[in-house]
Amino acid sequence: PFFCNYCNRENSFGLKFRNQSPEYVVDHIQYLHSEYGIEELTFYDDVMTLNRKATMDLMDALHPKKLGFKMSWDAETRVDLVDKELLLAMKEAGCRMMSYGIEHGEFIQEIKGGNATLEQSEKAVKWAHEAKIQTAGYFMIGLPNETPKTIRKTIDFAKKLDCTYATFSITMPFPGNKLYDEAVKSGLIQLDDTWEKFVYGGVGAGGIQAPVLTTESLAASDLEYWTKKAF
């Protein structure tokens, strides 16, 4: 819903947002618990906290006193869609880890939109840690205007945030999103590249994702080097 220029969700799933009711979610969790003994799970929702009221209602329903047992779970959202009260409620409802797509230490506003800023990223991580929730930060390397200097800013910012876990990925411009269109227009992607390269999580030399997009100052080998260095 924020039209992040690197995102492929708009083309894959459309723009319609649908919230499941707390009762619907709890029914599924109760079934998993009673049938399979499941007590840990992950909510695969890119922006779990998009609707704050709905999220708070869900946290109330997931509280161990109402659920009848303690469910440990992980989730992900944007840094500009959390606050202290919300994260504390999530912890009480069993949240173990919150993943944030922070993405970059220089171009965060350009690529994510909304109110996602470096300052807000610091607050989101801090609030989660204060609530005793682990954090995972996702970062991108290899945006069209990327240079060794901007990569270093991203690495330094990731170190400053001190997330529990950090993941660095080479930027993947999926066909159909704004980043891809801009890269093709700028000549940073050759249209005759084989489609098998456009696979999220695809790897190249050394287990690093094979670069599709290169920049004026960074070749594919440079992007692989910096991604390894970031880890």
Functional labels for PLM-detected ranges:
Residues 46-51, 78-79, 140-145, 169-178:
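Short, solvent-exposed turn/loop segments enriched in Gly/Ser/Thr/Pro and often Arg
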Residues 14, 50, 89, 118, ...:
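A broad, structure-centric signal for solvent-exposed, well-ordered loop/edge residues
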Residues 31, 134, 149-152, 156-167, ...:
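C-terminal accessory regions of radical SAM enzymes
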Residues 51, 105-107, 121, 147, ...:
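Intrinsic-disorder/low-complexity, polar/charged segments
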Residues 18, 144-147:
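Alpha-helix C-terminal capping/termination sites
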Residues 1-138, 156:
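Radical SAM [4Fe-4S] cluster-binding motif and immediate context
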